[in-house]
A protein has these predicted regions:
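Accessory alpha-helical/coil subdomains and C-terminal extensions
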Residues: 1-76
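Internal helix-turn-beta structural module
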Residues: 117-203
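Short glycine/threonine-rich loop-to-helix capping motif typified by GTGT followed
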Residues: 70-81, 101-115, 141-149
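C-terminal structural cap/anchor segments
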Residues: 89-90, 94-130
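Short, ordered loop/turn segments at secondary-structure junctions
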Residues: 64-66, 97-99, 134-137
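Generic secondary-structure signature for well-ordered alpha-helical cores
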Residues: 1, 5-16, 46-58, 79-86, ...
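Catalytic cores of large soluble enzymes that bind and process phosphate-bearing ligands
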Residues: 36-40, 44, 65, 69, ...
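A short glycine/serine-rich beta->alpha loop
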Residues: 34, 103-108, 182-186
Length: 203
């Protein structure tokens, strides 16, 4: 009934087979069905934390509910790196969720690539740190990359090939910028999708 009322409200022309299907009563219970959650963004962050721990980093999960502009998230992770670098501790800051990109340009990229690239200016000139962000499904935007990686050398390397980070972000062209400095992360399709994970590593 609800689906039919929505179709009527928006004057949707449904096929006769669709109308017939929607007129059937929705089953109230399915006794032979079991639902089990086998993965989530929270588990993704926990797995990332375990991996970082195995590499000697103290993992800190900042959130598994990240939901903001990709550029803002990248800048924020970059600022966290600047705050904690040089303290003699190996720390991994982990953020899971899904950011958004409001398109202002005509470039190529995805939210994870844009997040990573936006962190590059904050990391510029620093040693022993990086930020990377990936989609758990292995794809990021309309590209073959899962995400991107930047470190303290990235912005310098971009300048060396004539690429300005801020102009690139304004054109939403993170893919080509990261490609130029070997900063794309390409995994291929993973067969799952539990949002994205971004990590800032500091020593």
């Amino acid at each position: 009934e609800q689906a039919l009322s929505v179709a009527k409200k928006y004057h949707l022309n449904l096929s006769s087979s669709a109308q017939e299907l929607l007129q059937q009563e929705t089953p109230k219970s399915l006794n032979n069905v079991t639902t089990q959650i086998t993965g989530s963004v929270r588990e993704l962050c926990a797995a990332a934390a375990t991996a970082c721990w195995s590499l000697g980093y103290e993992p800190i999960v900042l959130t598994d509910q990240l939901c903001c502009e990709a550029r803002e998230a990248g800048s924020f992770l970059g600022s966290i790196v600047r705050t904690h670098i040089g303290q003699g501790k190996k720390i991994a800051f982990i953020a899971g969720g899904e950011t958004v990109v409001h398109l202002t340009g005509k470039g190529l990229g995805g939210r994870n690539q844009e997040l990573a690239l936006a962190a590059a200016p904050a990391l510029s000139g620093l040693n022993h740190c990086c930020v990377f962000s990936v989609g758990s499904d292995g794809t990021d935007g309309p590209t073959d990359a899962a995400g991107g990686y930047v470190d303290g050398q990235t912005e310098t390397d971009l300048h060396a090939v004539g690429i300005d980070v801020f102009l690139t972000l304004a054109d939403n062209d993170a893919y080509h910028a990261l490609q130029a400095v070997d900063g794309l992360i390409i995994t291929g399709a993973t067969g799952t999708n539990v949002n994205d994970v971004a990590v800032a590593l500091v020593e």
